[in-house]
Amino acid sequence: MGNKGYGFGAFKGVFTPSILTIIGVVMYLRFGWVLGNVGLLQSLIILTASTAITFLTGLSISALATNMRVKGGGAYFMISRSFGIEAGAAIGIPLFLSQAIAVAFYTTGFVEAFCDSIPFAEGWDVRHVSLVVLVAVLALTVFSADLALKAQYFIMAAIGLSLVSFFLGGAPDLATLKNVIPVSDLNNNDAALAIVESRSLGFWTVLAVFFPAVTGILSGVGMSGDLKNPSRSIPLGTIAAILVGYAVYASVVIFLDGFAGDSIQMRGALLEDQMFLAKCSRWTIPVIAGIWAACLSSALGSMLAAPRVLQALSHDGATPRFLGRGFGSNDDPRFAAALTFIIAAVVVYCGNI
């Protein structure tokens, strides 16, 4: 598989793509919904349980990374060298496909959020605009992973500003919020409570919806072939991303609960209004920019990781070998990236995602 690569460190190569996938669109658009369904205590239990599972996975990955010479392919490489290429391929191929399809989901999410936020973009065909964004993401990642990761620093700054705006915010005006409670019942607490209870989902359903939000560590692990010292960078970057992600999510849900208070009307708004977090914020624009950035960073992370998994599979003969061909001094997997793009484009054009 060669030893070519960019020579990234733990922060740039592992922590950055991992944390930007963990702090994603679910935090902005679905975390209020989680709180509205199960309350603060159970939200923290869901967050802790989900993070604990990811943390144990991170420890396992770290143990593998420190006990072998890690090359390109991330989780696939480590599994295949521990349990055999056949077992590795059985996991690596679905992993590649899931990351390629995720590029389509994140790109479409970015375009929908953009079109909903910008008046002149109303009416644009989401599929066509998504294809344009896909081309831009492909161009950024296929010619220079270094440039793509540098772009993620700006995305990280946008997400940081959105969090500052949120933490400086306060309780939103109930009149500006969408609500599961009809206007006629807003002042009738008994009727409002009955409506909210009928619309609320249980602990396990909410856990199933939220859990994928904190599993973004494979974006960083997938950069293993481009790390200067994978045995050090993978454990350090992965565990740091998990812990920072937990701290951010815990802080956000505690502040959300404080802003919403004990009002049943606010709980109804948490269930219905996806922009509740933005409407709590001191300034709305940084949060909208944060939502765009979260979608775009996740698309970039998946577009960086997926081709490298496919490249490693091809080097092992599990997929056609021409897909593993690398270009330039850094062994960029352009053929694998092209296939990733094609899969993502097909999913985008299927529509309704």
Where are the regions that the model predicts?
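Membrane-interface "cap" regions at the ends of multi-pass membrane proteins
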Residues: 1-62, 66-74, 184, 193-196
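Loop-to-transmembrane helix boundary motifs in multi-pass membrane proteins
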Residues: 6-14, 85, 125-132, 228-236, ...
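Select transmembrane alpha-helical segments in multipass membrane proteins
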Residues: 8-18, 45, 84-97, 129-133, ...
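Helix-loop junctions at the membrane interface of multi-pass solute transporters
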Residues: 18-19, 32-34, 62-67, 76-82, ...
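Membrane-water interface regions at transmembrane-helix termini and the short interhelical loops
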Residues: 30-37, 64-66, 90, 112, ...
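Helix-loop-helix junctions that connect adjacent transmembrane segments
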Residues: 43, 121-125, 157-288
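Hydrophobic transmembrane alpha-helices that form the core helical bundles
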Residues: 55-134, 138-139, 296-312, 353
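TM-loop-TM module centered on a large, flexible mid-protein loop between adjacent transmembrane helices
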Residues: 77-78, 116-120, 243-300, 320-353
